[in-house]
Amino acid sequence: MQLSRAAAAAAAAPAEPPEPLSPAPAPAPAPPGPLPRSAADGAPAGGKGGPGRRAESPGAPFPGASGPGPGPGAGMDGPGASAVVVRVGIPDLQQTKCLRLDPAAPVWAAKQRVLCALNHSLQDALNYGLFQPPSRGRAGKFLDEERLLQEYPPNLDTPLPYLEFRYKRRVYAQNLIDDKQFAKLHTKANLKKFMDYVQLHSTDKVARLLDKGLDPNFHDPDSGECPLSLAAQLDNATDLLKVLKNGGAHLDFRTRDGLTAVHCATRQRNAAALTTLLDLGASPDYKDSRGLTPLYHSALGGGDALCCELLLHDHAQLGITDENGWQEIHQACRFGHVQHLEHLLFYGADMGAQNASGNTALHICALYNQESCARVLLFRGANRDVRNYNSQTAFQVAIIAGNFELAEVIKTHKDSDVVPFRETPSYAKRRRLAGPSGLASPRPLQRSASDINLKGEAQPAASPGPSLRSLPHQLLLQRLQEEKDRDRDADQESNISGPLAGRAGQSKISPSGPGGPGPAPGPGPAPPAPPAPPPRGPKRKLYSAVPGRKFIAVKAHSPQGEGEIPLHRGEAVKVLSIGEGGFWEGTVKGRTGWFPADCVEEVQMRQHDTRPETREDRTKRLFRHYTVGSYDSLTSHSDYVIDDKVAVLQKRDHEGFGFVLRGAKAETPIEEFTPTPAFPALQYLESVDVEGVAWRAGLRTGDFLIEVNGVNVVKVGHKQVVALIRQGGNRLVMKVVSVTRKPEEDGARRRAPPPPKRAPSTTLTLRSKSMTAELEELASIRRRKGEKLDEMLAAAAEPTLRPDIADADSRAATVKQRPTSRRITPAEISSLFERQGLPGPEKLPGSLRKGIPRTKSVGEDEKLASLLEGRFPRSTSMQDPVREGRGIPPPPQTAPPPPPAPYYFDSGPPPAFSPPPPPGRAYDTVRSSFKPGLEARLGAGAAGLYEPGAALGPLPYPERQKRARSMIILQDSAPESGDAPRPPPAATPPERPKRRPRPPGPDSPYANLGAFSASLFAPSKPQRRKSPLVKQLQVEDAQERAALAVGSPGPGGGSFAREPSPTHRGPRPGGLDYGAGDGPGLAFGGPGPAKDRRLEERRRSTVFLSVGAIEGSAPGADLPSLQPSRSIDERLLGTGPTAGRDLLLPSPVSALKPLVSGPSLGPSGSTFIHPLTGKPLDPSSPLALALAARERALASQAPSRSPTPVHSPDADRPGPLFVDVQARDPERGSLASPAFSPRSPAWIPVPARREAEKVPREERKSPEDKKSMILSVLDTSLQRPAGLIVVHATSNGQEPSRLGGAEEERPGTPELAPAPMQSAAVAEPLPSPRAQPPGGTPADAGPGQGSSEEEPELVFAVNLPPAQLSSSDEETREELARIGLVPPPEEFANGVLLATPLAGPGPSPTTVPSPASGKPSSEPPPAPESAADSGVEEADTRSSSDPHLETTSTISTVSSMSTLSSESGELTDTHTSFADGHTFLLEKPPVPPKPKLKSPLGKGPVTFRDPLLKQSSDSELMAQQHHAASAGLASAAGPARPRYLFQRRSKLWGDPVESRGLPGPEDDKPTVISELSSRLQQLNKDTRSLGEEPVGGLGSLLDPAKKSPIAAARLFSSLGELSSISAQRSPGGPGGGASYSVRPSGRYPVARRAPSPVKPASLERVEGLGAGAGGAGRPFGLTPPTILKSSSLSIPHEPKEVRFVVRSVSARSRSPSPSPLPSPASGPGPGAPGPRRPFQQKPLQLWSKFDVGDWLESIHLGEHRDRFEDHEIEGAHLPALTKDDFVELGVTRVGHRMNIERALRQLDGS
């Protein structure tokens, strides 16, 4: 403790340097003056005689121990093992407690006992300590926390040993200062001055203040640092530290962050300060607020390994674990800190330690691709065969993570290569080990298996001398010569050269790279002093280096001591051994000798992660070899039990088969694939819905498909298998093989056989990135879990981690690619286009094809798209089901260690990748495969593979995915994505990749929308996992749809959505987090650009078509191409008439083409094509009229949209699509007809009407578009509500009116928004919308045009009454299904108007944006694509009759996974209208949604998120969303920020994903659901309300927010996923989606309180464009998945618009009346909303805010009228108002609220 001695000396009177320890105590007396008896402080620096480990015991006390001590000591010692009763006084609480404390335990343990026994909380409790009062002439002192209690002899003056528990203040020898003087000294100004002196190294001034009696134990109010911790982070602060210590600073005083000075020095890699502190008697084992030691922080932070060596040399304790069971060794491997790892192993770290997920350090290396660390572990004897709790070995984890080179290393490692440590670690001798054989002995014995030499270093009596290691190496060398004298010498020398001299410079070795050139645990204090004073004596070797690592000299070195060799830059160095003080021994060109470790860096022979295309390339290179055969390389065939069975699956039309298929993607059979017992086929069941069709037939997760309908599919690619399944229709005969490992009994069969999920690997990669992002996002949340440290550490290691993250990102993209199985390939796109009659996507193939971009963008895009579509990427969906059990939440099997949430993640991930992914399916599957891991990872940032630890690194793809799901409502991220799609097709593909780059004004907004979309996608994934194979089988469609959905949101959407996932745990509470981090990440994620590209591609490709018009109606080629990109956004936007249109408009004009070219096109192309039939519409038909109106409206908006005019005509057409849809549903149409009927156009402002007329013509022009544009697109202008657009694809165009009605009804909720419409301007739009729905009907014919693509999303808005569909001819139904407008089940039909299937036609709805803008914002109708997706679910069409409305086929198809899945059954039930994304649960919905939500929650994965997320997500998410959305709207196009945490509560991630967006609904579900149902009904009644929203249209351009709600709804709808989402969160999920409504006024938590319609109304209103819109959207949003849709809708760039009308829908849905707006519909709109003041004459849904005010007057509550009107509360909002909403509206009196609620019930009843 030379230092301590020095410190003492410095302290004031260098009492005797030779005995620094003694002096330390002495100094106290020495400075009788004002100098406080710092020594008495309780821990003399060295305490030569002190028994304490740190020799910290004050001299006096120890002497006591020796003298009087023996007796007392014995007293305390006697009890030794047994506890001793100690009386503890707590002066601050004026309490005294008698506690039994264990004398053999550290004081820290006794302190925790005391803290636990307190019944009052103490501020800054960590800085309270046990104080031994002065007695017998000895000064009182605080007991050092890391010394044993028995080392402090008890006071014999009292019957019971007495200690005080008090705040650590400076201990003064006597009262030298009176209170006044003391107070004067400790003013804020003085304390600040003191901190400044410390910062400036003003040692003299610091000493002067301390001499006056200043207490240095305080926190800086700004930074939270204390003087000692600040000094510990400074260079050359040795003297300063000594002065502070001697001035009474406590070595274990903690900063506000809970860190001691030792932690701070270690984190700063300040070896000199660390050495000084240790020499002053600090313990290396101080715990921070999380119970973690400096050594843990060192392993976590990386960098120069000298601090790690110093701590270990000073007997630092190994094996400290965080909340997730991660030890130092795990963290070192997680971040690739090789040198730290070697030091840890050398000092005895346990290589077999498992974290909460059962992952060992080798598993972590495999997961994070840390090859150098893995080599070190293997070389030192790590066991490769240890299985984590997911029953995976490190090799399997590496395969799952896609780290094939590392997997090869692990697999080929031979036991003969193991070289255990033959050297014995050296320890500092100065520390008194507790007990004769205290720590030293046990520690060496703890040596790891790699250490053959177990002889612990004899622990010499504690010697005051500094440890060898602590000295500079030069000194060390000399000391080596004479060990005995060395102690004394060392003291002096250390004082002299001590920390100052020595290889200060060298000791700070640069952070060791992967190769870990990090310094060896060299002890020398590393003062800045010259490297080596005199000759650096001989170097001392610690241990041999691991062979096989290659190093290059990065800087020259000239020898300065004996044995050193010169190095020149660029020379290859072979490292032979690691020495002390950061010196290594190596050979260079025949010269062998020592050199500083920081002069060399390890080089990786192959940089796998550097190339962005890695995943794809690597896969090509490696995956096939690992396909089937290699997975079981670890076990012999005899290890597997093969069980084959033939299952006959018979499903109903509207449902799926209930399984998710995963596997390799390939255009042609993969002949190279060799089936093995472990991996008998390329395609396998990733998940099977419990009690679903497949489940009942005996199929289980992990079963490999051998034959499908008699065709052998062992080597067949995913798409082909899906096609085979589809061909069979409702009957499927499959021959499957279950592979089970004999030894394993729990989920073994699934585990061993399941191919490693590629997604995991992707997730892994993503995980790194996702994790970091997510962790950071989650940090706040995780903090509670104690993950904060991991996060902080991650942050600290950020610089070093960054590369990993980047890699992860790029990998993530790759990974995402894997999920691309979902993603649409160029071929798929072409086929889709052909199917749709669209010209092939010119750019689509190219962009899709681009291997790299595609993989990157595709992966994410896929995810997004799938989410948006409601068909989650296969991977997600598959994973979800599997994960459900063991994925997101720790899988049950994995769950073993799910103690902390982080654990959950931790464990979750392993399961995720537990099954090896089939090689063939490699990339596609990838996306889902890793999800669990990802999640797990997320969960535990620092934990195991999938553990939170990973969080630091990029989040694994799965986690991200999960997050995205949760955040389904990504809000901002998508802006870029929107942009990308916007450009023309040709441009788009490339642009897509650059989605960010394409941020033209309009694009940008779209991009935002895109983000939304992405978010939506994320939820969709969860849902997907629920959906059966059929849905999944619509992979192409799904992909397309995803692309579509993603298209706008797409590019970054999926990825982003996922990314939030990383935050999975953390972000999920806010949901926002997601948005920002991941879900929303869409826009911001690294993959964003790729995503954009992907989206673009997808959009271009059938995907976007599939989303909107893909199958139902193929828009014109240009439309598809361009529109696709914009189509999604537009669709989404379109959904919300106002918001949607605005979004659309701002978004790619092309998508909105109608807008841009609408005017010209509209007029020129007066012929609209019927979306379903593809035949030209009669211009006079309602559909044509509606289309025309929409077109007109679009045209009027065109200018604003024009920026993205690509495919203007197409855009125009989309409007008609919607109309068409409406036309389809005659019943509904009729209901809405009065208000929205084609004749309604009259109602529409003239311009709008004209536009509507134009639209029809235009639609005719582009028959392809019309094909799927059944959406009943209410003219935008016509139907502001159109946004609501229930794209009902009624079976025939003849139901348009009714559809319109339905649409209107849905808007009913949004109608509130129309309320503003009621104002003069608004009124116009309102009526327009109404007219538009009828018009929409005609549009049906016309929508086929490009509109279809755009409209698809709009479609989502459409509510088809299921009954209606059933009533309509089956053919229509099929078409609708194709379009994605599957009619909702009859229950929904009753008035819900969930024209889910209609999603495709969604576009027209947006048309109603603003009274001013008569042009409908033609949103691409998602339905068509969805319909296409539906292909497999043609039955969906009939779903109208089916209550479940599996018909969500649009969505279901899109998110085939979720819809088909059993879950979807429920879901569909809940929200019939996926298409429109509002899954209104109408009457049924309320209940179903809950169950749905619950289901997901119930599932393991969901659960973990659910609890928190669910609740918070519902409220928070919605709220956040709302805020973001509102803000976004406010910002106009720009913000995509609304985070649509539109989680679909689907089985797949259901809960978690939904948790965010949906959580609200779920949590609020009871309310929300009921509200939703009533709202839905209201919606039905008031579809036009929604229509009114379009009024916002004009404003919406300006105020996308207004539009966005509808657009959102539309989007959702278009995203098949939306439906799925809505299905998943049947409760309010869809609504929740709508929830997103990104109203400009995010101010309302409305989002989260879906019920709070206040804001929503405004949203829907023209005013919606303002903040008002957001609120309305929220409530509606809650109801259905529309949010999802809407988010995709808003994808492109108008996040604000993203606030979709969805919320409107919600509100509407709230209205109980099932009739679709019959009365309102009949009137031209709710009449002019404004004019029709007499609220008695209108249905509640149609009330304007003024009607609401009149109604309040009528119930004698006029005093609240102003607030209600200010908040734009319209009739549709009223039923959704919650208690909080009322309070916000000024209704604070319970009586008033009850009166309002009672009056509302009477209204509902009337």
From Swiss-Prot:
Coiled-coil segments on the chain, per record: 1569-1589
Highest rank taxon of the organism: Eukaryota
Outcome, altering residue 1338 to L: Found in a patient with neuropsychiatric disorders; uncertain significance
A GO cellular component annotation in the UniProt record: plasma membrane
Stretch list, region Intramolecular interaction with the ANK repeats: 76-150
Effect seen on changing residue 87 to C: Found in patients with neuropsychiatric disorders; uncertain significance; disrupts synaptic localization
All residue ranges annotated as the SH3 domain in the record: 546-605
Residues with Phosphothreonine modification: 988, 1204, 1309
Any GO MF annotation of the entry: scaffold protein binding
Location (main, coarse): cytoplasm
Residues bearing the modification Phosphotyrosine: 197, 631, 1006
Function: Major scaffold postsynaptic density protein which interacts with multiple proteins and complexes to orchestrate the dendritic spine and synapse formation, maturation and maintenance. Interconnects receptors of the postsynaptic membrane including NMDA-type and metabotropic glutamate receptors via complexes with GKAP/PSD-95 and HOMER, respectively, and the actin-based cytoskeleton. Plays a role in the structural and functional organization of the dendritic spine and synaptic junction through the interaction with Arp2/3 and WAVE1 complex as well as the promotion of the F-actin clusters.
Source species of the chain: Homo sapiens (Human)
SS bond partners: none
Record region (Disordered): 407-467, 665-689, 760-853, 871-1021, 1115-1460, 1475-1525, 1546-1584, 1627-1664
PANTHER family per UniProt: SH3 AND MULTIPLE ANKYRIN REPEAT DOMAINS PROTEIN, SH3 AND MULTIPLE ANKYRIN REPEAT DOMAINS PROTEIN 3
Transmembrane regions listed in the UniProt entry: none
Protein name: SH3 and multiple ankyrin repeat domains protein 3
Motif (SH3-binding): 1485-1491
